[in-house]
Design a protein with these regions (language model features):
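N-terminal secretory signal peptides that target proteins for export/translocation
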Residues: 1-7
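Charge-rich, well-structured scaffold segments of protease-associated domains
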Residues: 2, 39, 44, 101-254, ...
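Bacterial N-terminal signal peptides
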Residues: 11-28
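N- or domain-start disorder-to-order transition segments that initiate the globular core
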Residues: 33-39, 43-60
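Active/ligand-binding-proximal structured segments within catalytic/core domains
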Residues: 48, 57-106, 283, 294-308, ...
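Short strand-connecting beta-turns/loops that link adjacent beta-strands
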Residues: 56-59, 219, 276-277
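Active-site-flanking beta-strand signature of metal-NTP-handling nucleotidyl enzymes
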Residues: 63-66, 280-285, 345, 447-449
């Protein structure tokens, strides 16, 4: 089963997708604010393929990733789920490889692989011994240019993604509610359509639909190659030119995405299910990202998210769980790394014996207190210290750097945006955080999601 899609808000993010650490971890000695995060080397092939190399010689392994600047928000109307479906079908063979052969070879060589689809990008990766990097490039370049599909492989895989939807969404009340909340938050933008697709449209996806999407978007000049591990940029350049460099560029279409209208009224979505044991609630606000809306608020919102939702020492957890004892869990979530607008989420789960209405009232009181009194300079300073520490820890993992840089470039950011993230976070002031909160937390641009138990009859 592929790691096929992930939610808009990842629990761990750094800057262009921020990485948060448990508050219990002792921070390392902080490097100067101007220190590089990953210090990658970059170059572009003649056919437009961007290449990023993160040298890390701690172990003789590499992570090899290919990111395409296309995702579920780029699908034709009526074809929801085709980006994710194509991700599955990319493992079904080429002119020279049988279905599943790539995966079998990776497994025989002791490697790991996976792929994932978001609204903005699709990515494929392998982690393997460094002396198998050339093999990975040969196979990945082959399916970039030579994917071959037939109804014989497409039809059974359609059943696979339908079962994936049933298991991950239709049988999970929280996922169902999240789908409805997101559809209510984005009134016009395709972010309101689930990445996996609507079931009735998924059933109609065809071989021709998949090939058309592939031929439209999968090209070297719409891709980013990221290699992290025990390699040099020159080694990667030679291999990339040999395998990817021979693939011709394509004429790419514009990414046409409708924008959001002015939102005038709050919305509320309630879902009851006998599968729900404990009620919960969240409030989503339409929010700017690095690339859309009032983007000057993106970095302050990241600091605010650390203050409000950064673990068991955060403001919301401390006040609602520890001090008031009305909640079993409470926090917030915000990710700035999307092409278009994003969301800022508050959530609360009441403590057993506490009514959901009481927990909701306590959460809303905290939001009102934030808007009235703001955050303090001390809270901002502590949050920035924790966030800078997270950037240092992020260097330890091959996949973390490859993921952050790939995601950033795929959503319109630059390598410099990633490398300068600690400086940009350090420059955030309490005044900027409070201004961002006042700008974003407008109830008219919000959706409240309520998940309730439903007694079985």
């Amino acid at each position: 089963m592929r790691l096929s899609f992930h939610p808009r808000r990842l629990a761990a993010t750094l800057a262009v997708g921020a990485i948060s650490l448990a508050a219990s971890l002792a921070p390392p000695a902080l490097a100067p604010v101007s220190a590089k995060v990953f210090d990658p080397e970059t170059f572009t092939l003649d056919n437009g393929l961007e290449v990023v190399v993160i040298a890390n010689s701690r172990a003789p392994i590499v992570t090899h990733m290919v990111w395409y600047r296309v995702g579920a928000a780029d699908e034709p109307p009526g074809k929801s789920g085709i980006a994710h479906f194509l991700e599955h079908l990319m493992f079904k063979g080429t002119e020279t490889m049988a279905p599943g052969e790539f995966s079998e070879i990776i497994a025989r060589n002791g490697g790991q692989e996976n792929a994932f689809t978001s609204w903005d990008y699709t990515a494929y990766f392998q982690t393997i011994a460094k002396d198998r990097l050339e093999l990975m490039m040969r196979f990945e370049a082959d399916r970039m240019a030579n994917l071959r599909l037939s109804d014989a492989v497409v039809d059974p895989e359609r059943d696979v993604i339908l079962e994936e939807r049933r298991s991950r969404t239709d049988n999970e009340p929280g996922a169902q509610l999240s789908e409805m909340v997101t559809a209510s938050l984005f009134l016009n933008h395709p972010y309101g359509i689930p990445i996996i697709g609507w079931e009735h449209e998924m059933r109609g996806l065809t071989t021709e639909d998949a090939l058309a999407f592939y031929e439209r978007w999968y090209a070297p000049n719409n891709a980013i190659l990221v290699v992290a591990g025990d390699v040099t940029a020159e080694e990667v350049r030679g291999l990339a030119e040999r395998y990817y460099g021979v693939i011709p560029a394509r004429d790419l279409p514009d990414r046409v995405r409708p924008s959001e209208p002015k939102q005038l009224a709050p919305r509320r979505v309630t879902l009851e299910s006998p599968r729900v044991r404990q009620p919960s609630l969240w409030i989503d606000y339409l929010a700017p990202s690095y690339g859309a809306g009032a983007s000057e608020h993106a970095y302050p919102l990241q600091v605010l998210d650390e203050i409000l939702g950064g673990g068991t020492t955060s403001r919301l957890y401390r006040r609602l769980v520890v001090e008031q004892a009305v909640a079993a869990g409470a926090g917030s979530g915000y990710g700035a790394g999307s092409v278009d607008l994003t969301n800022y989420r508050f959530y609360v789960t009441p403590r057993p014996g506490i009514e959901l209405d009481a927990a909701e009232a306590a959460l809303r009181a905290q939001i009102e207190a934030l808007l009235e009194s703001g955050v303090t300079e001390e809270e901002v300073a502590a949050a920035k210290t924790r966030m800078r520490s997270s950037a240092i820890y992020a260097r330890d993992s091959l996949s973390t750097g490859a993921n952050i840089l790939g995601r950033s470039l795929a959503t319109g950011q630059s390598v410099e945006d990633v490398e300068s993230w600690p400086e940009r976070i350090e420059a955030v002031t309490a005044e900027q955080v409070n201004a961002a909160a006042r700008a974003v937390f407008d109830v008219r641009r919000s959706v409240t999601g309520v998940l309730l138990p439903k007694p079985t009859s």
